[in-house]
Amino acid sequence: MTMSLEVFEKLESKVQQAIDTITLLQMEIEELKEKNNTLVQEVQSAQHGREELERENSQLKEQQQGWQERLQALLGRMEEV
């Protein structure tokens, strides 16, 4: 009878350890989910910022091209004079 009680107590202890481990892992999973959501938002924000910078870069290149064309036209007129 004593042997059965010892085995039961050991089993109970192992079950409790398993429950504690599962609880800790569930908490860790929740923390990781929150971190993942934060990182997803940061990535989306960075992508949005990159898209804006690419648009701005494109506009600046167009403006530069326009100024270069005007400058070439002015230099052409100066050579004619």
Swiss-Prot record:
It comes from the Bacteria. Keywords: Cell cycle, Cell division, Coiled coil, Cytoplasm, Septation. Residues 43-64 are annotated as: Disordered. Residues 48-59 have a biased composition (Basic and acidic residues). One of its GO terms (biological process) is division septum assembly. Residues 5-81 form a coiled coil. One of its GO terms (cellular component) is membrane. Gene3D superfamilies: 1.20.5.340. Its main location: cytoplasm. It holds the Pfam family ZapB. It is found in: Cytoplasm. Homodimer. The ends of the coiled-coil dimer bind to each other, forming polymers. Interacts with FtsZ. Belongs to the ZapB family. NCBIfam families: PRK15422.1 (NF011951). Non-essential, abundant cell division factor that is required for proper Z-ring formation. It is recruited early to the divisome by direct interaction with FtsZ, stimulating Z-ring assembly and thereby promoting cell division earlier in the cell cycle. Its recruitment to the Z-ring requires functional FtsA or ZipA. This is Cell division protein ZapB. It comes from Klebsiella pneumoniae subsp. pneumoniae (strain ATCC 700721 / MGH 78578).
